[in-house]
């Protein structure tokens, strides 16, 4: 619940963790920084926004996941882009993701469609690896004491 928001209930929408920060900024009256990736959920929570996103695409190491209210689909590729494996969960029957049905013949068209969705919706730099930042040494650590 957000202070000043009288609307109660839940919205069956896809939200992402990156949406939390801009939402908190807007809720307390701070400007949302321009580099923020997410979208504020304030209009969604107050019922003003009916055009909220219908899916999310997530990258984790070599895996790319598409999910919406109906499906969760993950595909893994090697560094050269070659297919390594995949999994599909049908949320209407398996919301806990216990049965991978990606290779079931009856889901072939669903898998093909979700693969197209991933390609169509991801950004051009989506598959680039983010370089690891050098961590500054903190005073008081063992590394600091060894110098």
Model regions: which residues?
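C-terminal cap/loop subdomain of S1 sulfatases and analogous C-terminal strand-loop tails that border
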Residues: 6, 13, 18-92, 96, ...
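Active-site-proximal N-terminal segment of extracellular/periplasmic enzymes that hydrolyze or transfer
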Residues: 101-107
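Short amphipathic alpha-helical coupling segments at ligand-binding clamshell hinges
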Residues: 110-114
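Active-site oxyanion-binding pockets that recognize sulfate/phosphate
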Residues: 7-10, 104
